[in-house]
Amino acid sequence: MSRPTRIYVVDNGGQWTHRIWRVLGEIGCDSKIIANTTPVEEIEADALVLSGGAPRITWESPKMGKCIDYLQQFDGPILGICVGLQLMALHCGGKVGPSDVPEYGLAKLRIIEEDDLFKGLPREFHVWESHNDEVKSAKGFTVLAVSDNCSVQAVKHLEKQYYGVQFHPEVNNTEHGEEILRNFAAVVKHRRD
């Protein structure tokens, strides 16, 4: 019997970081929350989730700790949530800026590109948003989903094992949030095995 998929949650100060950890545990992953200052060489995980958080990435990126190191040196899939996605996009040459319409609450997500992250899910469903900034251009990524007010709601990198979502799959209000995290865990397990 193989060991559970080990996915660590990098704490970027988000109010729902513990929910990511809890959902991952509920779906059978070996998960723990780690500080975003944890050195890469101390991380013994199959994958990372860069949690959301309060930093405005365009001028408060130092609050993201060693997340750039993780993107440069961690050898495994990474899922960026909210500010985690924004940092990932910026690091890969994209642009991040203030949202034309800041979002807080439910939004209708539309999947525009099939991918394992949304495997088995409907083409449209409601997700929980909480952001003032957003990815304006996602250089090096395929955009997987959009909403009425945000043209980059979910992405997958063209070459690296990077996934990102602007919304919060860990929040109860997000329909199919557990399935999205389960699908990410399946991608990680497939890569590991």
Residue ranges and their predicted role:
Residues 2-5, 165:
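Active-site proximal loop and beta-alpha junction motif in alpha/beta enzyme cores
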Residues 3-4, 30, 38-39, 113-124, ...:
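Short, glycine- and charge-enriched coil/turn segments that flank and shape catalytic ligand pockets
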Residues 4-10, 14-81, 92, 186:
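Flexible gly/pro-rich beta->alpha loop and the following alpha-helix that scaffold active-site loops
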Residues 65-81, 86-179, 186-187:
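Pocket-forming structural segment of enzyme catalytic cores
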Residues 187-193:
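Charged phosphate-binding loop/patch that engages nucleotide di/tri-phosphates or the phosphate backbone
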